[in-house]
Amino acid sequence: MGNCCSHGRDSDDNKEEPRPENGGGGVGAAEASVRASKHPPASPPPATKQGPIGPVLGRPMEDVKSSYTLGKELGRGQFGVTHLCTQKATGLQFACKTIAKRKLVNKEDIEDVRREVQIMHHLTGQPNIVELKGAYEDKHSVHLVMELCAGGELFDRIIAKGHYSERAAASLLRTIVQIIHTCHSMGVIHRDLKPENFLLLSKDENSPLKATDFGLSVFYKPGEVFKDIVGSAYYIAPEVLRRKYGPEADIWSIGVMLYILLCGVPPFWAESENGIFNAILSGQVDFSSDPWPVISPQAKDLVRKMLNSDPKQRLTAAQVLNHPWIKEDGEAPDVPLDNAVMSRLKQFKAMNNFKKVALRVIAGCLSEEEIMGLKEMFKGMDTDNSGTITLEELRQGLAKQGTRLSEYEVQQLMEAADADGNGTIDYGEFIAATMHINRLDREEHLYSAFQHFDKDNSGYITTEELEQALREFGMNDGRDIKEIISEVDGDNDGRINYEEFVAMMRKGNPDPNPKKRRELSFK
């Protein structure tokens, strides 16, 4: 899709990013809201002169310093340096990772950066995944602006506490597996899961946990096999070493993390990397040394099932979440959470047609990197390559993602996404229905959508203009246009101005920075 709204925003991230606040090197981040984040006043964004196209992000170059003030260095890694940065418009603080383009020495390096941007855009909005705020490219560097994880690494917090219970370990694991269940249901394999890639949003006792560093992550389709050996030695699954693997490799890595959480040492250890790999391939896990004799049988059962050398016999993320040990404190659900795409479809169903048309316009303005993940999901569901998804294809596609729905629920979702009511979901309808609602926080997207309706550039959307737009998209459902206008028209002048339009678009959307996220407690 085109770049008509792409405002030098999107983003990218890279392998081995510097770790904020604890000197490490992962795609650190998580927005430490220095002030409460309320929506800024709705006013059309100023027109900006576009620069030349950047070779890495493939869109106009832009100076990150026009929107952010860069501060102290937070960390340094192989590919980049991370600085604290402050958004000029709001005063909010973020992390800005700068990648020198001279370090991207070949086509593969550039593709890795682009893919990471696409994946982070695809996952942005999930509560326990670091959020990408934007990416900028100038002559010398690519700059990634993301949430600031000021709380440091998860394991550092555990070590500082000095002790924790199996119940606390189960709570941590539940959050980590829920994150990966979301990734897998959205067609992403992380491929580099390790303790260093889980950061805390803040230094608060109950700070949310954030998954970071998607530099090695890939999009995948069910049944797809990967062959390249990537990851960190202690956490690599045996099938990765054998160059034939899929999403099951992530579960192995989390199983290694659980083993370490329970006993303090990795299950496969040696003096050299090759020695570690040989130990992994042998598959022998020690459950006899201290403290394993006093660890509960249920915990050991889960570790064994996550570290099964046969990926076909290994538990899936959904099965891990249903294991008795993880559910012991009663907080874990009986079934995995609905996958993110299904939740978005449900939300889309509740929107009025005016808002749905606006979302179609915004979907057409998103950059390729913002919708790449959804594009792949659409292609995966469109099994006959017709360019549309039928009811049966939607049913099968949701089932492959691990979502169990009744026939009625599938039909309801079909009706929600099929905006023009022709019995199938086309590409534009799918993107509009499933793109994350945080796209509505971007002023340039909202303004472009408003301009689409405001044909005469009067600054208002009239009854005639709204009727024309609904007809254009085949979405005039018989409701009186004046009734729709009256729902949105705050000052009762019979037309809709930009501020009223923005209020309608944001009404009923989830808070992009909810205070109540999944919380951790170390007891």
Curated annotation (Swiss-Prot):
Residues 369-404, 405-440, 441-476, 480-511 form the EF-hand domain. Residues 332-362 are annotated as: Autoinhibitory domain. One of its GO terms (molecular function) is protein serine kinase activity. Keywords: ATP-binding, Calcium, Kinase, Lipoprotein, Membrane, Metal-binding, Myristate, Nucleotide-binding, Phosphoprotein, Repeat, Serine/threonine-protein kinase, Transferase. Residues 7-20 have a biased composition (Basic and acidic residues). Ca(2+) 2 binds at residues 418, 420, 422, 424, 429. CDD domains: STKc_CAMK (cd05117). Transmembrane segments: none annotated. Ca(2+) 4 binds at residues 489, 491, 493, 495, 500. One of its GO terms (cellular component) is cytoplasm. It is a lipid-anchor. Residues 68-326 form the Protein kinase domain. A lipid is attached at residue 2 (N-myristoyl glycine). Ca(2+) 3 binds at residues 454, 456, 458, 460, 465. Signal peptide: none annotated. GO terms for biological process: regulation of pollen tube growth. May play a role in signal transduction pathways that involve calcium as a second messenger. Belongs to the protein kinase superfamily. Ser/Thr protein kinase family. CDPK subfamily. This is Calcium-dependent protein kinase 34. It comes from Arabidopsis thaliana. The gene is CPK34.
